[in-house]
Amino acid sequence: MSSLKGKTAFVSGGTRGIGLAIAKRLASEGADIMVAGSSEANCAAATRAITAQSEGRIEAHAVDLRTLEGCQAVFDAHSRVFGGCDILVHSAGATRGGVFPDQDDADFIDGFALKFHAGVRLSRLFWPLLAAAHGNVVMIVGGASRTPDAKFMVGGAVNAALANFSKALAGQGLQDDVNVNWINPGQTETERLQQLLSTRARDENLSIDDVRAERMQAEGIRRLGQPEDTAALVAFLCGDEARHIHGAGIAVDGGATKGYF
């Protein structure tokens, strides 16, 4: 498939989990890719993995997206390499699990810095390039943005803020011809999910298998998602066939979300 051939994409958090799956999928459809990750080792591994299934140009940049300087640095790197940008995917931002009120301010500050503030900053920096290209923004948010969980307060608060920002950004996109959508992945088999399961198992003195089974039962789902499930939707949203989908938040959660909003 080459529906995105000639396009350039930037994927934050693109070295692991859902972000890596997104970068692979976009590259397999012909896009040139820059991914940003938190370490040189992750960036090197991601570059090898993406290059193995793509003939396009693949670049990776290790950076701390929690800071304005980090966001600026990765934007400058992308601009030097590619010049323009057709697709911005913000997938960075694992928040810390825990039980309130034991979680302190640092957990909330860190969560907002990496997922929310980085999303805002990257959108601001890349916006002129995206407007020039009549491009696409896809934010990877999360179902907790709509269904608060007392045991996932940091993630829920951050996700809700990012979803609200994404909807507002879509309004600006109507004026500047930039498509903006966001995705709410459900329980997805990643290292991040394993960390959350481990944290809850520790806090509640349960086994990880028990926590996993409890979570699936509570959400009424038959299976956990795979990163490729979300990646497939991102690729579709960035293609011409999805041009009239704008300002939408779409769940990829196996039916876990019970409401229809």
Regions found by a protein language model. Name each.
Residues 8, 15-16, 39:
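Conserved glycine-rich cofactor-binding loop
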